[in-house]
């Protein structure tokens, strides 16, 4: 087995495979792709947020004060069923959105005059969110990458442990695109697994870009 290879100019080797992205239900498409952080910044700058004293961190469903108190920001609750395994259901308070009522009262307005709260955006698929955020450069670029990789149908709030192997692999690739990779070699393990031929063409286009 080769333990080390001398390759001038190469400092990193990254494996992009189809293994699941963790088991944490708090990890979503938006958080893994870096979209959620950018959205929180945008919502913290809205007039409603400033008026109420909300900061960037308040819009986190993990630790922020706008997270749902019923499920603590997980979007689900467990029911104790005697003599049977616990049953997990969507939180009845937030209906799976992970956020409390106050979060729904803070709206982001785009140039077209459309308004949406952060819970509403997290419930959109990538394509719909991209349409809404056309005038928000940092968010738009990240969403465009996801769509270019054929992930436009995934909702931003989709839990990453629920993704298929092919989806997980493309999401990992999306998280790397946009960073400086001049000294990096990527190793892909069956990148076309589970993909429709049209999606394979899209993926090849990304490789060649």
Question: Positions of the model-derived regions?
Answer:
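Conserved phosphate-binding elements of NTP-dependent enzyme cores
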Residues: 1-209
